[in-house]
Swiss-Prot record:
GO terms for molecular function: phosphatidylinositol-4,5-bisphosphate 4-phosphatase activity. The lineage of its organism: Eukaryota, Metazoa, Chordata, Craniata, Vertebrata. Its EC number is 3.1.3.78. Residues 1-10 have a biased composition (Basic and acidic residues). This is Type II phosphatidylinositol 4,5-bisphosphate 4-phosphatase. Catalyzes the hydrolysis of phosphatidylinositol-4,5-bisphosphate (PtdIns-4,5-P2) to phosphatidylinositol-4-phosphate (PtdIns-4-P). The active site is at 106. It comes from Xenopus laevis (African clawed frog).
Length: 256
């Protein structure tokens, strides 16, 4: 919005000011997470003779040269190396600014989003979806802790949000797409169960083989019962090997 008495299309820096370093106050980190929408873009002529369009960085307020970048949705600041949106997000998307100043893009119906930076990994709760006009300032998200647990993957070591409220279940890591067990009680319990069932079925098969040999020579259908007993026992032992070899993932902090 233009100031009183100043045309919104007038240059931010007058031609008589020369090469002046922007004197905007330093960026102060807000506590609340913000869903960031780009301002309505207006090409602003720079003080040089070429009239190159520029825009202020949303993080450090430095001027960003937009020459040759007007087709992009976001541009990168050469001072702080952070991204600044210059166009509205694609249809069905929205911008979110993480407290570490990383600009993220997600679906406009998303409730949570994770920061991909290794030194942050923050889970951002976006709160209920609201349609915000572009002219309005960015609205802070609700400061609500996510309902779930941060879990360290047993395969890749990355942290992800696990939404189950009980332990000893399986979880799929969104980073490596592999399945692991949250806690070790469930795999051990199922491994012992399948070993017991497999050995029982194999012993039954051995008993049938020894005890019904003469009967099987007259009634060949008896061989089917042998095969079923051995097959069920083998399947149980294979499942026991699966549960015995599964990786364990452990929770970091619980917010539930």
């Amino acid at each position: 919005m233009a100031a009183d008495g100043i045309d919104e299309r007038s240059p931010l820096i007058s031609p008589s000011s020369g090469n002046v370093t922007p004197t905007a106050p330093p960026y102060i980190q807000e506590n609340n997470l913000q869903a960031e929408l780009p301002p309505p873009y207006t090409a602003i002529a720079s003080p040089d003779a070429g009239g190159v369009p520029v825009i202020n960085c949303r993080v450090c307020q430095s001027l960003i040269n937009l020459d040759g970048k007007l087709h992009q949705h976001v541009v990168k600041c050469t001072v702080c190396n952070e991204a600044t949106p210059i166009k509205t997000p694609p249809l069905g998307k929205k911008y979110v600014r993480c407290p570490c100043n990383c600009l993220l893009i997600c679906k406009d119906i998303s409730r949570r989003i994770g920061c991909p930076r290794p030194n942050c990994r923050r889970i951002i709760n976006l709160g209920p979806v609201m349609l915000i006009p572009e002219e309005q300032p960015a609205q802070p998200a609700l400061p609500v802790q996510p309902d779930g647990t941060r879990v360290v993957c047993g395969h890749c070591g990355n942290t992800f949000l696990w939404m189950e409220l009980r332990f000893n279940t399986l979880a799929k890591c969104p980073h490596c797409k592999k399945i692991s067990s949250v806690g070790s009680a469930l795999p051990r319990r199922r491994c012992c169960t399948y070993i017991t069932m497999g050995m029982i079925c194999i012993f039954i098969g051995v008993g049938l083989t020894v005890g019904t040999q003469d009967f099987a020579r007259r009634f060949h259908a008896t061989y089917v019962s042998w095969a079923v007993a051995y097959l069920v026992g083998l399947v149980c032992l294979v499942r026991a090997c699966y549960w015995g070899a599964i990786k364990f993932s452990y929770p970091e902090h619980s917010f539930a």
